[in-house]
């Protein structure tokens, strides 16, 4: 028997406040939906927006692309909500997001990308992380996709987006999620392999470049004399020892 979703208090966020202002087109989030019967080019933009939202990439990568789901969406065999679910439960999404983060950070990423808002508090992270432990990653994604919050804001035909990122009362909007929460956490970034230089031989003498003699330096003439390797045949001054 699985544990039900634990209670967590809500916090004040822009997306919880009703909007009465009228923003310019540049400030409003563009809504990609199939309710308007999009053309072929508009469908391409909708698919690109879905990949950008779920994978947080501005380009569709070959590794993340799901051509079968794209074909089903183009021929109206599945809804946008099912397409979003297919992207979120794909192996590429799991490898790029779940395998390189802990459960708490994975919850934060999924809530931002699927529900279009930030997590309310640490208690919400704990509550959803318990769902991951009980139902697995696919069960957790299904809980978000089938939640009342998702259906009320996006329904079956709208691509999720960051809700109320800009409001009329503020000069600057909130930071986009792809900049606020990058793919890799601090724990994983510290484990990344850093490039190392492997020297084949031992370094006997090293002089920094700024300390190397330049043209006209007497040291260069002294080295030239050493390179001549002149050995005198006799010693005019027997009292002196040859070097």
From Swiss-Prot:
Compartment(s): Plastid, Chloroplast thylakoid membrane
Domain (PBS-linker): residue spans on this chain: 11-191
Topology in the lipid bilayer: Peripheral membrane protein
Domain of life: Eukaryota
UniProtKB keywords: Antenna complex, Chloroplast, Membrane, Photosynthesis, Phycobilisome, Plastid, Thylakoid
GO cellular component term, pick one: phycobilisome
A single BP term in Gene Ontology: photosynthesis
Protein family according to the UniProt entry: Belongs to the phycobilisome linker protein family.
Note: Although originally identified as Cyanidium caldarium, these sequences derive from Galdieria sulphuraria.
Subunit structure: The phycobilisome is a hemidiscoidal structure that is composed of two distinct substructures: a core complex and a number of rods radiating from the core.
Function text: Rod-core linker protein required for attachment of phycocyanin to allophycocyanin in cores of phycobilisomes.
Annotated protein name in UniProt: Phycobilisome rod-core linker polypeptide cpcG
Source organism: Galdieria sulphuraria (Red alga)
């Amino acid at each position: 028997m699985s544990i039900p979703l634990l209670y967590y208090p809500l916090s004040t966020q822009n997306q919880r406040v009703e909007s009465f202002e009228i923003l310019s087109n540049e400030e409003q989030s563009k809504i990609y939906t199939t309710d308007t019967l999009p053309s072929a080019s508009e469908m391409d933009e909708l698919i690109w927006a879905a990949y950008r939202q779920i994978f947080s990439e501005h380009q569709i990568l070959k590794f993340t692309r799901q051509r079968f789901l794209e074909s089903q969406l183009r021929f109206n065999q599945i809804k946008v909500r099912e397409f979003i679910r297919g992207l979120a439960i794909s192996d590429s999404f799991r490898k790029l997001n779940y395998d390189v983060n802990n459960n708490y950070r994975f919850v934060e990423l999924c809530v931002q990308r699927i529900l279009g808002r930030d997590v309310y508090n640490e208690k919400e992270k704990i509550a959803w992380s318990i769902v991951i432990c009980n139902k697995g990653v696919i069960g957790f994604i299904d809980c978000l996709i089938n939640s009342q919050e998702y259906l009320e804001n996006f329904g079956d035909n709208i691509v999720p987006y960051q809700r109320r990122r800009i409001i009329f009362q503020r000069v600057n909007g909130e930071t986009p999620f792809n900049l606020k929460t990058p793919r890799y956490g601090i724990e994983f970034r510290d484990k990344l392999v850093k490039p190392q230089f492997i020297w084949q031989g031992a370094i006997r003498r090293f002089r920094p470049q700024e300390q190397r003699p330049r043209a006209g330096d007497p040291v260069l003439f002294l080295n030239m004399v050493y390179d001549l390797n002149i050995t005198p045949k006799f010693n005019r001054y027997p009292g002196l020892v040859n070097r």
